[in-house]
Amino acid sequence: MEQLVSRLEAVTNRLEAVASRGGGSTIKAAVDDDPAWFDDFKVFNAKFLSGFVNDTIALGGELEQMGKFVNEAFHCHLVLMEVAARHNRPSQTDLEGLLKPLSEAISKVQDFREKNRSSKQFNHLSAISEGLPFLGWVGVAPKPVLYIQQMEESAQFYTNKLLKEFRESDPKQANWATSFIQLLKGFAAYVKDHHQAGLMWNKEKSAATPAALAVSAHKPPVPPPPSGFAPPPPPPIQAPTVTHAVTGSHSSEDSRSQLFAQLSKGSEVTAGLKKVTDDMKTHKNPELRNQPPLKSSALDPRPYTPPNLKKFSAPVSKPAKKPALFQLQNKKWVIENQDGNTNLEISECNDKQTVYMYKCHASKVHINGKVNSIILDSCEKCVIEFTDVISTFEFTNCKACKVQIDGFAPTISIEKTDGAQVFINPKCLESQIVTAKSSEMNICVMKPDGDLTEYPLPEQFKTVWNPATSKFITTTMDLNL
């Protein structure tokens, strides 16, 4: 079996060499004017991408379904490359439409991984989920190779786990992990050779539109049932066509028959090649070295720099700003989403009501009377002034906020806040102040003569072991030192 596989691979390589030179070969592409970069991609796609799908499905379990999702993503990528080879660069709106099917196919892979976190093959699924977005290079410029390498590094985190786990116990799993990384490296080399500044388009053709996908798209080939690792398939002898179907002697059945006829010849497949004489060799014919280099294809335009698409998916619009709210709901004063409003006042209140201020910015609230409690949550640069509270005044998740207490508050709580200025009168010195995960906290005591005395609250603490009590003792660091 191994000898047969080796023989098929050798014949495949010879066929590829014949097809790439185009001389003396009976196999001819259905579309003659495809750029050279697309011909190279079709060979890579057939030999490596399709082979990886088959190897993935062969592992069974959740990878069987994952392989089908990967096959769908590779198919969308192939169709998009075909459109680029036969159309000019589209507008930004049309480009997003062309990228949408590929983006959705990649999302299916990532969603499937998230739904199977308890799977024994989670590292396999994660490697694919982290690495497969490399197909999004088609929307990245001007450095798509760097993008592919980043996806490779993300996938390698999980493939290294697989190698560590299965290198000795199950070489089949380890070989799969290695082959995936080699696939990513190989594709990065292909992009570096042909699309270094971004996806190439055919400048001599009309601009592409999403309708080109419908013309070009066909149902992805169904991968064969898993039966172990299969040898790489031979390169396609007929390029997929966008504008018309191939009929007559170029039909798929005839092409398949031609391929098997070539394979059956064995080593005689290269008998029809022309012999390379000394006058055709560069190192033996000085005149050839003096000639300017030939272009790979007349339809292979120079690289250009498309608009920078930092993200593969379409930009997401910012969430709409929520409306401001200031009203009494049952026994709760609700103040939300106020921005720059410094004239908020609660004049009619009682000791059974509470005040809740949420996500306000640069606003000020004055409370005339006694309430049960006051909470400032996720506010920034806000000021609140009140007379008395029965239970607690609280800062939570705030930034650079101030409070002035004209009367008394039994408890002042400051939690997850950066920047809190608390102005109190001498009657409030008996209040209990509780802080947690906060910084830049100051208590300012207002004297009868109008002066202020500022006391910073500690942010650093020191913990030491007390052998006498067999306990840890925590003390504050003196901020006045």
Swiss-Prot record:
**Broad class of where this protein is predominantly found:** membrane
**Where found?**
Cell membrane
What SMART domains does the entry give?
Answer: CARP
Q: Which Pfam families match?
A: CAP_C, CAP_N, CAP_N-CM
Membrane topology listed for this record: Peripheral membrane protein
Q: Name one GO molecular function term.
A: adenylate cyclase binding
Q: Which UniProt keywords apply?
A: Cell membrane, Membrane
Which regions are flagged for Basic and acidic residues bias?
A: 276-287
One BP annotation, GO:
actin filament organization
**Residue intervals of the C-CAP/cofactor C-like domain:** 319-457
> Ranges of Pro residues compositional bias?
220-238
| Cellular component GO terms held in the UniProt record | cytoplasm; plasma membrane
Answer whether the UniProt record assigns the keyword Membrane to this protein.
yes
Annotated function: May have a regulatory bifunctional role.
Family the entry assigns: Belongs to the CAP family.
Which PANTHER family does the record cross-reference, listed alphabetically?
A: ADENYLYL CYCLASE-ASSOCIATED PROTEIN
Instruction: Tell me what this protein is called.
Output: Adenylyl cyclase-associated protein
Q: What is the source species?
A: Hydra viridissima
